[in-house]
UniProtKB/Swiss-Prot annotation:
Swiss-Prot/TrEMBL keywords: Aminoacyl-tRNA synthetase, ATP-binding, Cytoplasm, Ligase, Metal-binding, Nucleotide-binding, Protein biosynthesis, RNA-binding, tRNA-binding, Zinc
Gene that encodes the chain: alaS
GO biological process assignments: alanyl-tRNA aminoacylation
Family: Belongs to the class-II aminoacyl-tRNA synthetase family.
Cofactors that this protein relies on: Zn(2+)
Protein name: Alanine--tRNA ligase
Keyword field contains Hydrolase: no
GO cellular component: cytosol
Enzyme Commission numbers on file: 6.1.1.7
């Protein structure tokens, strides 16, 4: 594959020039809530550019997985209908953090364009910012001035936000020839089809102030991004990015599955392109730990999948098909991105389950659309509210709603629909902004000398001093008795909540006062926040204090964290290599582990998992930790790591018997410290994600004791020895089963006797046979049972039965024949007429409906009402 060659050669080029090859970060940023998805190579280096993070290298190169399908950068609606829009793409990039700047960056880009990309130098153009004379002069070393163009801020100025690092940028474009347009220069090529941008070089040299001034940065940075798919298309000479390499292979697989042939210029061409792109986006997102859902990123994934299914219907797919395309993707990209290969079964299972659910939704939505058409027959207009509900709740695409409406000579109120859609988007934007605003805390503006030094792996108590105090969201100089707030220490033994492990609690004290630490967090890298309350005295900034962790609680937390690791490994050993952690939480009382698995775990497998963990506890392995370079362990098959996580250069490896994981948490000293392990329960939390909750130590012992007590009580109730409880229960159940059978036989006899009486009460006018009858104090579910039995015995067109319950409430049930439904009638229409005057409620389906009311008309009046409906509707 050309893409594999280009990617490899690009990274090698920069690696040979002292750049560190940094693995792609996940397609979603863990610690940057400002964006839904990773949409550029620089996302994972954002904190470096903002001077919030330091790394051991000053030059880096990456091939970054990107998704643009939500938020500000959203290409979703364009995908399939243009030559180059994609939701998933790869961004090749090189970065300089205070190292080289414009001259070297431009020289590198030119050399790569010729020697790695093998582009014709006579067809390369460059743009620079209109004020960037330096970049213009540097490009003149490689290009004639007539192929260098000056553009405004709109095109050639980059900024991360309204304030902060920013700078001029320079774009490289390739002239694809007159086949793609008659524009003579990039300035005339408004569509960008002929002069195709393939690389953008950003020069971060300014800091924009709140007043809008541009101040020179002390350290200048370089951030570049080259679109791999565009380069492949250019070098392959194809009209679109879809007709070469990986995407063309996925289209070919779709051709094979659908039995249809891809033609780029035909209407079905868009369907092939959408399916190829969306399959790739979904696969990478699921491999990185995302799942379709109803909020934020999960909602976007679900939208992508449903869009692919909708286009698949145009190709004739009526059942799940996306999973069958994924192996072709893994075969071509699995070597560069091993997470695809490791997650293949998970990707396929999630896709298939989502598709199955969506096809069911579409079926329900189609039925609802038919109801909407009936209810709107007087106006011949589907309201915007109904159309929006069908799309938003049931996933029925707007174009399908419009097509069906057209078939019935209906129109859709598009203006209201789009208004409601925009209101929903605005609510979503506000919710996202609200959820993100919590991260903009006072801690971002604190002036601290250095980051907090954590010594808590080895010491649970230390002497330190207070660097800062916070109360009610503001930095303060002191905290007095009974005041709640937070402390930041120069050195701390307190572990801050992260990685699924709850933070420590304890005390911070000196001769002047004591601060009770309730919990500990880390809102930004290197800062540990101790939350709590002054129990006595007063504490002030720069004061010398002693920090003491609650040792007993810490030990319990560490034991549970080690138990979580053992459980994770036991799951993999018992169920298979597809097991991947999808989330975890450990505190001093319990373990919670979420993991990828398509179905409920069999009881015998749960027992095996529990036994295996306890076996490792009894073996009493020393829990060992060591530091290692991430580059040395990143490809290890033995050491568990999570593709959704971002790791620093130096990582911590925790080994506990057969378990080896990258982990920054605290742990037991020996596996035997856990004492005993018990699983509380196992259940689903999302499509393809299961959860196990478990306990260790005294909590596990208490659970075993409670189980023992429960067995004793059951034995007492059953009047049976404990070792014979199961047999006794089976005998009791068999007896109940036999009794239920006898009761059922008696009920059937009574029903048949009653049916004979009901049949005698049937009436017929012309060709309409019907029954209206009152059954005193019958159970409500019996009404439907009687109606169904009657329907099987004689061809009644309408049955209406009602009963009075002991509490005085009336229940009424109606059933109509299939031929009446085909005429457009519904059983609930009848109940509506009967129950509306007396404030009743009703619901049901076309054929049968049930309602209730506190009062009903007298029997004669009720019969008259029902008869009037029959005479007007049926006779």
């Amino acid at each position: 594959m050309l893409s594999n060659t280009l990617r490899s050669n690009f990274l090698k080029f920069y690696a040979n020039r002292h750049h560190t090859i940094v693995p792609s970060s996940p397609v979603f940023p863990h610690n940057d809530p400002s964006i839904l998805f990773t949409n550029a190579g620089m996302n994972q280096f954002k904190d470096i550019f903002l001077n919030k993070e330091t790394v051991s290298y000053s030059r880096a190169t990456t091939s970054q997985k990107c998704i643009r399908a939500g938020g500000k950068h959203n290409d979703l609606d364009n995908v399939g209908h243009t030559s180059r829009h994609l939701t998933f793409f790869e961004m090749l990039g090189n970065f300089s953090f205070g190292d080289y700047f414009k001259e070297q960056a431009i020289a590198f880009a030119w050399e790569v364009s010729l020697s790695v990309f093998n582009l014709d130098p006579d067809r390369i153009y460059a743009t620079v910012h209109e004020k960037d004379d330096e970049a213009f002069a540097l490009w003149e070393k490689h290009l004639p001035s007539e192929r260098i163009f000056r553009l405004t801020d709109k095109d050639n100025f980059w900024s991360m936000a309204e304030t902060g690092p920013c700078g001029y940028c320079s774009e490289l474009l390739f002239d694809r020839g007159e086949k793609f347009g008659t524009a003579a220069s990039p300035l005339e090529d408004t569509e960008g089809e002929r002069f195709l941008e393939y690389w953008n070089l950003v020069f971060m040299e300014f800091n924009r102030t709140a007043e809008g001034s541009l101040l020179a940065l002390p350290n200048k940075h370089v951030d570049t991004g080259a679109g791999l798919e565009r380069l492949v298309s250019i070098l392959s000479g194809t009209n679109t990015v879809f007709e070469a390499d990986v995407l063309r292979l996925l289209i070919s697989k779709t051709e094979q599955l659908s039995g249809k042939t891809y033609h780029a210029d035909e209407a079905l061409g868009a369907a092939f392109r959408v399916i190829a792109d969306h399959t790739r986006s979904l696969s990478f997102a699921i491999a990185d730990g995302l799942l379709p859902g109803n909020t934020e990123r999960g909602y976007v994934l679900r939208k992508i999948l449903r869009r692919a299914v909708n286009y698949g219907k145009r190709l004739g797919f009526t059942q799940p098909f996306l999973a069958d395309i994924v192996p072709s993707l893994v075969d071509t990209m699995g070597e560069a991105y091993p997470e695809l290969r490791l997650s293949l079964s998970q990707i396929q299972e999630v896709m298939t389950m989502e598709e199955e659910n969506y096809f069911k939704s579409l079926h329900r939505g189609g039925n609802l659309l038919q109801q909407v058409l009936k209810s709107s027959s007087s106006s011949s207009i589907i309201s915007g509210e109904d159309a929006f509900k069908l799309k938003d709740t049931y996933g029925l695409p707007l174009d399908e709603i419009a097509l069906l409406a057209k078939d019935y000579d209906f129109t859709v109120d598009m203006e209201t629909f789009y208004q409601l859609e925009e209101e929903a988007k605005e609510r979503s934007r506000k919710n996202i902004a609200k959820s993100h605003s919590s991260t903009d805390t006072v801690y971002d503006s604190l002036s601290l000398g250095e980051n907090s030094e954590f010594v808590g792996y080895n010491d649970l108590s230390c002497d330190t001093f207070i660097e800062a105090l916070v109360s009610n969201g503001k930095q303060v100089s002191s905290l007095k008795e009974k005041e709640k707030g937070a402390l930041i220490l120069k050195v701390t033994p307190f572990y801050a909540e992260k990685g699924g492990q709850i933070g420590d609690s304890g005390e911070i004290f000196c001769s002047d006062g004591t601060f009770i630490v309730s919990h500990t967090t880390s809102p930004k890298a290197g800062i540990v926040i101790h939350h709590g309350e002054v129990s006595q005295g007063q504490l002030s900034q720069d004061q010398a204090v002693t920090a003491q962790v609650n040792c007993i609680r810490r030990k319990k937390i560490g034991n549970n964290h080690t138990g979580c690791h053992l459980l994770h490994k036991a799951l993999e050993v018992t169920l298979g290599d597809h097991i991947r952690q999808a989330g975890s939480y450990v505190d001093d009382t319990k373990i919670r582990l979420d993991f990828t698995h398509p179905k409920a775990i069999a009881p015998e497998d749960l027992a095996s998992i529990e036994l295996l963990v306890n076996e490792k506890i009894r073996e009493n392995h020393r829990v060992e930790t060591r530091e290692a370079m991430y580059s040395d362990v990143m490809n290890s098959k033995e050491i568990k790591q999570f593709f959704g996580d971002k790791y620093s250069d130096v990582v911590r490896v925790v080994s506990a018997g057969f378990s080896h994981e990258l982990c920054g948490g605290t742990h037991a000293e020996f596996t035997g410290d856990l004492g005993y392990f018990r699983i509380l329960k196992e259940h689903a939390v999302a499509t393809g994600i299961r959860r196990i909750e478990a306990v260790t130590g005294r909590e596990a012992e208490a659970l075993a004791h409670q189980d023992n007590e429960n067995l004793n009580e059951i034995a007492l109730v059953l009047q049976s020895p404990r070792d014979q409880i199961l047999n006794k229960l089976q005998n009791v159940l068999e007896e109940r089963k036999e009794q239920a059978k006898q009761i059922s036989e008696l009920e059937n006899k009574l029903i048949h006797s009653l049916l004979d009486k009901l049949i005698d009460g049937c009436q017929q006018v012309d060709d309409v046979s019907y029954l209206i009858h009152h059954l005193p104090e019958s159970e409500s579910h019996r009404l439907q049972q009687y109606a169904n039995c009657l329907h099987q015995k004689i061809p009644l067109r309408l049955i209406s039965l009602w009963t009075t319950q002991k509490n005085g409430k009336y229940i009424i049930f109606s059933r109509i024949s299939d031929d009446l439904v085909k005429q457009g009638l519904q059983a609930k229409d009848l109940l509506k007429i009967v129950l509306t005057p007396c404030g009743g409620r009703w619901g049901g389906k076309d054929i049968f409906a049930q309602g209730s009311a506190d009062n009903l008309p007298q029997a004669d009046a009720l019969n008259n009402t029902l008869w009037q409906w029959i005479s007007t509707q049926l006779i």
